[in-house]
Amino acid sequence: MINNVGIDIVENKRIKLKKEFIIKVLSTNEIQTFNTKTKKQKKEFLAGRWAVKEAIIKTLDQAISMNKIDIEYVNQKPVIQNKELQNILISISHEKKYAIGIALKQSDNK
């Protein structure tokens, strides 16, 4: 059962490729992936992570730093790797100038 929903959209041009911002948003594992991308891909990657992590945070009862949330692709789908957040389903989408993230938090009661 879904008990909370978060959604966020960001315009890619608002994303700055500054070290401080990258460290604020991305986990250590995500930074490794980020570093393999072209400049355009980096902006899109960072925008997507920002949007989906904002969406995740909106579903939570307590604050968490963005860089503590680790997302990897499994079977071509984004999956939160943090054990304590695995009850949250996510999706990231890109459309021309925008990235959007959605998070659906499932209740522990089935």
Curated annotation (Swiss-Prot):
Please tell me one Gene Ontology term that the record gives under cellular component.
Answer: cytoplasm
Give a GO biological-process term.
Answer: fatty acid biosynthetic process
Q: Catalyses which reaction?
A: apo-[ACP] + CoA = holo-[ACP] + adenosine 3',5'-bisphosphate + H(+)
GO MF terms listed in the record are: holo-[acyl-carrier-protein] synthase activity; magnesium ion binding
State the EC number(s): 2.7.8.7
Q: List keywords of the entry alphabetically.
A: Cytoplasm, Fatty acid biosynthesis, Fatty acid metabolism, Lipid biosynthesis, Lipid metabolism, Magnesium, Metal-binding, Transferase
The protein's location, in the record's own words, is: Cytoplasm
Chief location bin: cytoplasm
Which cofactors, if any, are listed as required?
Answer: Mg(2+)
Where does this protein hold Mg(2+)?
D8, E54
Q: State the family named in the UniProt similarity comment for this chain.
A: Belongs to the P-Pant transferase superfamily. AcpS family.
Q: What does this protein do?
A: Transfers the 4'-phosphopantetheine moiety from coenzyme A to a Ser of acyl-carrier-protein.
The entry's protein name is Holo-[acyl-carrier-protein] synthase
